[in-house]
């Protein structure tokens, strides 16, 4: 089964980094990668539908406009079943606490450990089966 991953980050180089790090898994059909540059754009993509439908969202916290914690709150209102992993360069206790309180599945600090992230994604996918 292919899992769609929606990566939400306002930094354009993040999309390229994720494309590089997940190149093999995308080629093998394990993951389908989707990208949004803002919280608002992520909500539009979710409303329009993302295929395949099993989705994991990876969102930066610090973004202009709707930040990642606001996005997390909106996603949990609209699609509470979707796992959302927060990714941030700021791993302070307050952000970690808020992310957990708002329903984040994971809290990941940058630079991203992609081996660990892939393990966490596999675990989420296995739990959904």
PLM features: residue spans?
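Conserved phosphotransfer cores of two-component systems
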Residues: 25-26, 47-52, 74-81, 102
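C-terminal output helix
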Residues: 94, 112-122
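Active-site T/S-Asp motif of two-component receiver
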Residues: 58-60
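Acidic, metal-coordinating helix/loop segments flanking the phosphotransfer/catalytic sites
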Residues: 19, 35-56, 77
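Two-component/phosphorelay signaling modules centered on CheY-like receiver
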Residues: 12-35
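Alpha4 helix (beta4-alpha4-beta5 surface) of REC/receiver domains from two-component response regulators
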Residues: 70, 91-108
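Receiver (REC) domain active-site loop signature in two-component systems and cognate sites
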Residues: 63
């Amino acid at each position: 089964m292919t899992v769609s991953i929606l990566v939400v980050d306002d930094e354009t180089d993040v999309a390229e980094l994720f494309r590089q790090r997940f190149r093999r898994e995308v080629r093998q059909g394990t993951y389908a990668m989707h990208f949004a540059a803002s919280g608002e754009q992520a909500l539009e993509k979710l409303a329009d539908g993302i295929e395949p439908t099993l989705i994991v969202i990876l969102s930066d916290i610090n973004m202009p406009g709707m930040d990642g914690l606001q996005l997390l709150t909106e996603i949990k209102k609209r699609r509470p079943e979707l796992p959302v992993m927060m990714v941030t360069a700021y791993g302070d206790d307050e952000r970690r606490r808020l992310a957990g309180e708002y329903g984040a599945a994971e809290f990941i600090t940058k630079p991203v450990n992609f081996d660990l992230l892939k393990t966490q994604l596999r675990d989420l996918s296995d739990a959904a089966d």
